Amino acid sequence: MAHQTQRRDTADTMTEVEVWDSRTAQEVNKSLYPPAVTNPFTHHTQLSAWQLACSIFLGTVLVPVRVSCIVFLFLLLWPVALLSTINLPIQPTEPVKSWRKHLIKPVFIFLLRLAFFCAGFLIKVKGKKATREEAPIFVVAPHSTFFDAIAVIVAGLPSVVSDTQHVRIPLVGQCILLTQPVLVRREDPNSRKTTRNEILSRVKSKMKWPQILIFPEGLCTNRSCLVTFKLGAFSPGVPVQPVLLRYPNTLDTVTWTWHGFSGFQVCMLTLSQPFTRMEVEFMPVYIPNEDEKKDPILFANTVRINMANALKLPVTDHSFEDCKLMISAGALRLPMEAGLVEFTKISQKLKLDWDNIHTHLDKYASVAVSSKGGKIGIEEFSRYLKLPISEPLRQLFSLFDRNQDGTIDFREYVIGLTVLCNPANTEKILQMSFKLFDLDEDGYITEQELTTMLRAAFGVPDLDVSTLFQQMAGKDSAQVSYRTFRRFALKHPAYAKLFHSYIDLQAAYIYSLPGEV
């Protein structure tokens, strides 16, 4: 009777556990829907036989002529670039003298626009460019190619944010220095903070610094969506002018992503076209309200949504970290898309950092690499847990399989382990599980006790749990203490969810028993 009372207490406790657990899990789950765009970091231009033939034929004529014209213009640009950067410091502390601004900049802009015209670019400008007093910062999106540098020319060579290494490139370095750039040192761990402070000091300064142009996405995408904006342009809390980029061409030859055409291929294909259309649209200046001034994330998201609406594109929470995960997935012999999890959303909602998610990717790869599509099926799931395919296992698998397509991708795996298998009350779940498995109540679980309980749970009378028990207890141990049990369950959280499910079944069974008289 004492034993039955203990089980009733367990059932009552389980009711409280469910209340604690469900609200948080439901709120997190609602905000973790799959992204509207699967992979914004790849691009594959499909050339028809006719398009390929035209590109080859026109390329043999146009490429040599265009390259010759561009080289000639660059020879003219070289002395202008040298003259414009004489005695200019790499990291300026005050605005340049007015003669550089009024005499050299217009010549520089004219020659650069002429060079892009020779390359076949027909540039259409919409809207009105704001003055520095109206908007100290331009935010330009979507960023999809190195040809987006045209936006810098159209905007009148405002200051850009660039890596210090780019300044050392001949001619390109002089072009960057002329804009009085905000330079980033990748090797400096405080680089992000330093850059943010430099942008803030310039936009708040009473000196006549040029406007700053920033690509807030921070990397090239395929223009199918707007990914997460970095906060550098929005932290100062000053008005910004959104600038939209479009390439309304029948054949897309300009897009340059991590996985797609190389830079050389993009250049050759683009130079082989009769012309390449580009639109640069200056949207109305966006002035942040008081809440947005205090919250850069809110400010960035509002501007991003406005730009996405104007472009008629969706927004996703992919970021640069997703791109790194995609590359890591490829190195682990998984499809590159396997690494895409919408890092910004996942990290914020589930409180995971880069190291956590990268560790999850390594574990996921060890399970999924044997499957054909780089996803975990029910068979791989069963082998990973060393348990037979049964109804409880299928139920657990379906909890991970959020889109119910019969497989678990990496995003579902991360969400499942974090939301489903790591409830806020994990310690209570493990304590109750251990008590249920410890049939003789001696403080230890033996292989026989584990076998008895799991056979009952899975409905498999000949279930062999020796491998699982050895993995839990160690090769030379015949019993498992609570400390060992807890360490194993925390290291393999999918088991914690199975134990949780088993407690639910026990609670339901106890509630169905007739009451005591």
From Swiss-Prot:
Chain segments annotated as coiled-coil in the UniProt record: none
NADP as UniProt keyword: no
Binding site for Ca(2+) 2: D438, D440, D442, Y444, E449
Highest taxon of the lineage: Eukaryota
Gene Ontology cellular component list: endoplasmic reticulum; membrane
Annotated membrane topology: Multi-pass membrane protein
EC code(s) of this entry: 2.3.1.-
Binding site for Ca(2+) 1: D401, N403, D405, T407, E412
Designated name of the protein: Lysophosphatidylcholine acyltransferase 2B
Protein species of origin: Rattus norvegicus (Rat)
Gene: Lpcat2b
